Structure formats: C-alpha cells, structure tokens
Amino acid sequence: MKLSLSPPPYADAPVVVLISGLGGSGSYWLPQLAVLEQEYQVVCYDQRGTGNNPDTLAEDYSIAQMAAELHQALVAAGIERYAVVGHALGALVGMQLALDYPASVTVLVSVNGWLRINAHTRRCFQVREQLLHSGGAQAWVEAQPLFLYPADWMAARAPRLEAEDALALAHFQGKNNLLRRLNALKRADFSRHADRIRCPVQIICASDDLLVPTACSSELHAALPDSQKMVMRYGGHACNVTDPETFNALLLNGLASLLHHREAACKELL
C-alpha cells in the first residue's frame, strides 16, 4: 500500500498518521498538513480500494483488516511508533490499531468518532445507500456535502462544492468497494474493548455535526481509560475542513500535551 511521508522536520521527530473517513482520500487532511509538518513527520494515504491504492475489496472487509494493512505498510516504511489522527471511520481504524498494536500507537486523536454506530448515524447512511442504489455515484456524491458541512458554510461556497463534486465523481471508489467499507464501519463495535486502549486519547467533536451526534464522543470519552474531550461549537462533521484554525489549534495542543504525557509516563516506568 502506497503511503505519502513528509520529511521529518528534525531528527527523530514524532510520526503522525492521518486516517480519513469513508471517502478514504488522504487529501481530506490538506488543511492540517502545513501546520503538522512543522512539528512532525506526517503520513497520509489513500485507503485500500480508493485513490492511488486501487483494489477490489472482499465482501467481509473489516476495520481490523484496514488497521493491519496500514500497520504493515508503516513497518515496511521503517515506522514502528506513531500517533494516529482519525476522522469517523478513521477513528475506528485508530482504535483498532491501539488495540492490536499497543506498542506502536503512542497517541490517538478521534475526530467525530464513536464506539459503535449510533441509530441516527445508521439512519443517515441508510438514506445515502438508497440514493446510491437509485441514483448511482452522482447522487451519492451530490448528497455527501449535506452530511459534512454546515448550511451557511456550503451556501457561501457553491462554486467550490461544485468543483469538489466533479473531482469526487471522477475519483469515485466504486459502488462495491464503498458498500463494503461502509458495512465494515457499521459492524464495528468497540463498546466491550475500549477500556483496553491504554494510550492517551484526544476526542474532538463538533456540536453541529449532522451525521454523528456529540453524544457519541461523550460515550467514547466515558469508555476510554485516558481521554480528554474537546467540543467545537461550529464546523459540522468535517470540522477540520470548515474551521481549520480552531481545529488545528486543538489538534496541535492536544498532540503536544499527550505525547509529553506519554513520554513522561514511559520515563516513570524506567
């Protein structure tokens, strides 16, 4: 699997791996790259079955497989310890990495994530699936911004959204791959295993997220042994895109604090 690695800003700089949501594209994190690359070596990638990592996914494709193939690609690139920043589905992959490779994951940041899919989120995806089956890729792509962005943000950026729609349609991951990735997301359930995640976790959510209620982040916060929760008042599901200034400040402060916390804890053990 192809990865995109930025040059380390200094020797032995911490590594931060960015995992996008259902869309799977590493370019989702473009508003974060410049600020993160000043402090960290940053890894982005298109998830298997999307973008520059094309493949035909199996019907039983799972979050555990997503985590395993990413970890293997990181190890092949010489990266054995890393922090993870995951959005929605990417946050699920991050939790799976923290469970399966605890010696590798130093810190986890969950952005609009959850323990198991909420009834409201499931309903949203059911509507989107019906659009996909009845109207094809174009209907899926055109509806997607409604679940990602606040209405006023969209209204002020109509030409941008039209361009994004055209790009998303041109690089659509395919109906079968999309549904298999979506089914993996819907099957994932960390409610019985979250207490085994020992790395420090920063939880970021947006109070106006149409797709994932903030209660999901509250449940996640309550279930994790070592977590902190930050709520953005504005931004929608894709709050890192719509309000990058607020999001980036939270992310940078959180990473610095949690990595220091992890380093101090490791020294105490020594």
Swiss-Prot record:
Keyword Hydrolase (UniProt): yes
Highest taxon listed in the record's lineage: Bacteria
Gene3D superfamilies: alpha/beta hydrolase
Stored Pfam families: Abhydrolase_1 (PF00561)
The EC number(s) this enzyme carries: 3.5.1.-
GO function terms (MF aspect): hydrolase activity, acting on carbon-nitrogen (but not peptide) bonds, in linear amides
Keywords from the UniProt entry: Hydrolase
GO biological process: nitrogen utilization; uracil catabolic process
Catalytic activity annotation: carbamate + 2 H(+) = NH4(+) + CO2
InterPro entries, A to Z: AB_hydrolase_1 (IPR000073), AB_hydrolase_fold (IPR029058), AB_hydrolase_sf (IPR050266), Pyrimidine_utilisation_RutD (IPR019913)
GO cellular component: membrane
Function per UniProt: Involved in pyrimidine catabolism. May facilitate the hydrolysis of carbamate, a reaction that can also occur spontaneously.
Family: Belongs to the AB hydrolase superfamily. Hydrolase RutD family.
Name of the featured protein: Putative carbamate hydrolase RutD
Source lineage: Bacteria, Pseudomonadati, Pseudomonadota, Gammaproteobacteria, Enterobacterales
Gene: rutD
